[in-house]
Swiss-Prot record:
It holds the Pfam family Globin. Red blood cells. Involved in oxygen transport from the lung to the various peripheral tissues. GO terms for molecular function: haptoglobin binding; heme binding; iron ion binding; organic acid binding; oxygen binding; oxygen carrier activity; peroxidase activity. Heme b binds at H58, H87. Signal peptide: none annotated. The lineage of its organism: Eukaryota, Metazoa, Chordata, Craniata, Vertebrata. This is Hemoglobin subunit alpha-D.
Amino acid sequence: MLTAEDKKLIVQVWEKVAGHQEEFGSEALQRMFLAYPQTKTYFPHFDLHPGSEQVRGHGKKVAAALGNAVKSLDNLSQALSELSNLHAYNLRVDPVNFKLLAQCFQVVLAAHLGKDYSPEMHAAFDKFLSAVAAVLAEKYR
């Protein structure tokens, strides 16, 4: 699935994200809520206004989970098992939403990193986010 070159590029992208995890994670959530308003239904108790403490906090959690996945590229299923259980059994999030958030995270990366986000990095990170979304959806079967 992920080649050695993909893994190298994914780590390089994540190094560029360092220090901006909360910002990028919350911006990706905001973009998802705007582009796909149906996703708001999973956050009825959140203040969904831009920059709210709850969106920033959840954005930080999203970025932390992605950071954990980057550290565990060879074993994503194990690294994301608890998160998969939470979303499948407790929160019952429709797995299509993982792909929507992944797409929004890609937009955030491209917007913030600009030329530092090469087409090769984009392709590798897209494969990574697709793998993360697939792992998070595993428990639904």
